């Protein structure tokens, strides 16, 4: 009987934890888990373990949290584990070539886009923002470049007109784990050969920036509608209303023209605001100190705040 593959897993957020769950339920041996150092979180800025660390500890898997994998000591520690394969999912640290060369079968990565489109840090949100018709997960053999390695397999899902960054994230977190298990089996028996990426089709999903979440009402309505969906649940698009921050969690396209940012109408159906082209109907908002509410509820209780002619973003 052959020994089970010795796998090292490296990942940090919830998306990665879903992949680790699948590996823990597989016949493979998870010999160690690598994850980012604990980070301050919440109002108290208390040090919090990553979702991957929490899951690994529940299953009594050794957890490694080196600040970098460039240090010779960290590389020696990894080599001592004698891994057959390293599975990397949203880890957040760069793996130098010496690390990629340690496992017998190399390192594979589950990336939340249909490569070579949307290499980089925020592929899910950028796909929604761009109005892409589909997204998916690509499992690739890692090399030193950023998301440039040969593609082993893909799992595809359509992006709907209602998808947010959050809903697409959750769907891809379901698609990724079985794809990784399939790729591992194919690598182990030698049946899977990677497809080289066409660099001419590549683009880069830049990390999300909170400043991008400020709504620029001079932009076309359809562009802003996609941005609002892409940036939900983080960092959440926002504007200002009477010098107070107004978070915008949901909107749809509406008829109307006017000076960008101007309230054209308000009713239980939503707050219609003029954009550079056409208008947006804001349907779910959050005022300072309040919780997210459907506009119908705000309209009933705070109607005076949303008078026609009021300008957002001033």
UniProtKB/Swiss-Prot annotation:
Binding site for (6S)-5,6,7,8-tetrahydrofolate: 113-116
Any Pfam family matching the protein: Formyl_trans_C
EC number(s) stated in the UniProt entry for this protein: 2.1.2.9
Keyword Transferase in record: yes
GO cellular component terms attached to this protein's record: cytosol
Alphabetized PROSITE patterns for the sequence: GART
InterPro entries in the record: Fmt (IPR005794), Formyl_trans_C (IPR005793), Formyl_trans_C_sf (IPR037022), Formyl_transf_N (IPR002376), Formyl_transf_N_sf (IPR036477), Formyl_transferase-like_C_sf (IPR011034), GART_AS (IPR001555), Met-tRNA-FMT_C (IPR044135)
GO MF annotation, one: methionyl-tRNA formyltransferase activity
Keyword entries, A-Z: Protein biosynthesis, Transferase
Family assignment from sequence similarity: Belongs to the Fmt family.
HAMAP family: Formyl_trans
Function as written in the Swiss-Prot or TrEMBL entry: Attaches a formyl group to the free amino group of methionyl-tRNA(fMet). The formyl group appears to play a dual role in the initiator identity of N-formylmethionyl-tRNA by promoting its recognition by IF2 and preventing the misappropriation of this tRNA by the elongation apparatus.
Protein name: Methionyl-tRNA formyltransferase
Lineage of producing organism: Bacteria, Pseudomonadati, Pseudomonadota, Gammaproteobacteria, Pseudomonadales
